Swiss-Prot record:
<dbReference type="GO" id="GO:0015979">
    <property type="term" value="P:photosynthesis"/>
</dbReference>
<protein>
    <recommendedName>
        <fullName>Cytochrome b6-f complex subunit 8</fullName>
    </recommendedName>
</protein>
<dbReference type="GO" id="GO:0045158">
    <property type="term" value="F:electron transporter, transferring electrons within cytochrome b6/f complex of photosystem II activity"/>
</dbReference>
<dbReference type="GO" id="GO:0009512">
    <property type="term" value="C:cytochrome b6f complex"/>
</dbReference>
<keyword id="KW-0812">Transmembrane</keyword>
<comment type="similarity">
    <text>Belongs to the PetN family.</text>
</comment>
<keyword id="KW-0249">Electron transport</keyword>
<keyword id="KW-0813">Transport</keyword>
<keyword id="KW-0472">Membrane</keyword>
<comment type="subunit">
    <text>The 4 large subunits of the cytochrome b6-f complex are cytochrome b6, subunit IV (17 kDa polypeptide, PetD), cytochrome f and the Rieske protein, while the 4 small subunits are PetG, PetL, PetM and PetN. The complex functions as a dimer.</text>
</comment>
<dbReference type="InterPro" id="IPR036143">
    <property type="entry name" value="Cytochr_b6-f_cplx_su8_sf"/>
</dbReference>
<comment type="function">
    <text>Component of the cytochrome b6-f complex, which mediates electron transfer between photosystem II (PSII) and photosystem I (PSI), cyclic electron flow around PSI, and state transitions.</text>
</comment>
<keyword id="KW-0602">Photosynthesis</keyword>
<dbReference type="InterPro" id="IPR005497">
    <property type="entry name" value="Cytochrome_b6-f_cplx_su8"/>
</dbReference>
<keyword id="KW-1133">Transmembrane helix</keyword>
<dbReference type="GO" id="GO:0031676">
    <property type="term" value="C:plasma membrane-derived thylakoid membrane"/>
</dbReference>
<dbReference type="GO" id="GO:0017004">
    <property type="term" value="P:cytochrome complex assembly"/>
</dbReference>
């Protein structure tokens, strides 16, 4: 149970980090949040 939660959290953080990097490079201010 804890193992699955750990992997889910790790995957979520990893995906979020990738998304932030991609938005930071491709957005260039066009996607202004």
């Amino acid at each position: 149970m804890i193992f699955q939660i750990g992997w889910a959290a790790l995957a979520a953080i990893f995906t979020f980090s990738i998304a932030m990097v991609v938005w930071g490079r491709n957005g260039d201010g066009s996607i202004d949040i």
